[in-house]
């Protein structure tokens, strides 16, 4: 018996060593395929979230981190905690101006803003906001759109009393509650929250704020310069996965609705909320340097983001990965 156990132990030992070596060899490969993604919890950010569901078949693993607002995504990028992030164009522009080493590599939705008033506030147009309190989230595209709309209508504004319109800065998650509680007269809100306010009867649409030079604001996918330059094969895989997830949401509305309503919002939004939200913030892929430059110029004009050195869009909007991904997936949409 002892004679038999000797070779057996040796073979077990060799097998164990082989397994450990195998794991050690495999681990770096697995670690190499992880993409750290920053995201926000909105209906039109749903396709970005869906990337993690199809990531295994793309040959990657997504670590999704959800933040309250886009500027938080930029802070995490500066801290070296993310490879890619989803944010409004304004947050990306402020981030780049503030030293975030990022490129805009795609758009993923457009629109996603609505000026909503209390039904009893007597606000039928932007001009009616004179003397009112308007809630908005600081550092989102919504603040830029609100400033542009007020300026177009000859109204002054500040976050203290004394101007035509008083801004009250609140998190996106708190705006509806403040409107419902009649602490505000109107809010510039995202989706699906603005649709919810209207469908639940405590808000009425004043305008969708797309008549400024910005038009419908594009939400941006940003990538760190390091990831774009040094992790090219993984960046290419990620972009193909992004295009595939987005295309799936555009083509299969039922799947998109189920995922956003059940997985992201855990049944807190209705079918009507989802349909109205996506009607006002459709999924997309594209972004242009021109759009980012106009948005930058408007931010500078109204002093939003307070950038010492506004970035030049053509230096940091890089859509080559997107175009390549769209081509490789049968030509895109």
Residue ranges of predicted features:
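Bacterial N-terminal signal peptides that target proteins for export
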Residues: 1-16
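Sec/Tat signal peptide C-region and signal peptidase I cleavage site
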Residues: 23-31
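Short, glycine-/small- and polar/acidic-enriched structural segments
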Residues: 32-169, 181, 185-191, 202-208, ...
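Pocket-lining segment of extracytoplasmic ligand-binding domains
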Residues: 89-91, 161-164, 168, 173-262
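Conserved C-terminal helix/tail region of periplasmic/extracytoplasmic solute-binding proteins
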Residues: 300-333
């Amino acid at each position: 018996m002892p004679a038999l156990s000797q070779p057996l132990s040796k073979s077990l030992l060799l097998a164990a060593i082989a397994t450990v070596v195998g794991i050690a060899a495999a681990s770096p490969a697995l670690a190499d395929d992880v993409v750290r993604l920053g995201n926000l919890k909105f209906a039109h950010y749903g396709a970005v979230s869906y990337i993690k569901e199809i990531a295994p078949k793309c040959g990657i693993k997504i670590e999704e981190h959800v933040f309250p607002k886009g500027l938080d995504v930029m802070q995490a990028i500066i801290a070296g905690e993310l490879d890619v992030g989803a944010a409004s164009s304004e947050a990306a522009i402020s981030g780049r101006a503030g030293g975030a080493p990022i490129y805009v590599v795609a758009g993923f939705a457009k629109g996603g803003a609505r000026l909503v008033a209390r039904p009893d506030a007597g606000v039928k147009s932007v001009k009616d906001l004179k003397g009112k309190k308007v809630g908005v989230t600081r550092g989102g595209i919504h603040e830029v759109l609100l400033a542009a709309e007020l300026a177009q209508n000859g109204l002054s504004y500040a976050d203290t009393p004394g101007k035509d319109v008083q801004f009250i800065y609140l998190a996106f998650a708190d705006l509806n509650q403040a409107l419902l509680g009649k602490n505000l007269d109107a809010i510039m809100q995202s989706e699906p929250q603005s649709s919810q306010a209207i469908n639940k009867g405590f808000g009425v649409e004043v305008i969708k704020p797309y008549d400024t030079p910005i038009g419908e604001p594009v939400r941006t996918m940003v990538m760190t310069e390091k990831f774009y330059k040094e992790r090219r094969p993984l960046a290419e895989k990620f972009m193909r996965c992004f295009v595939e997830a987005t295309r799936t949401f555009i083509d299969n509305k039922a799947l998109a609705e189920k995922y956003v309503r059940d997985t992201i919002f855990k049944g807190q939004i209705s079918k009507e909320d989802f349909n109205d939200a996506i009607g006002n913030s459709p999924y997309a892929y594209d972004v242009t340097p021109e759009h980012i430059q106009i948005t930058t110029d408007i931010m500078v004009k109204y002093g939003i983001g307070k950038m010492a050195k506004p970035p030049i869009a053509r230096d940091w909007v890089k859509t080559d990965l997107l175009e390549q991904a769209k081509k490789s997936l049968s030509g895109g949409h």
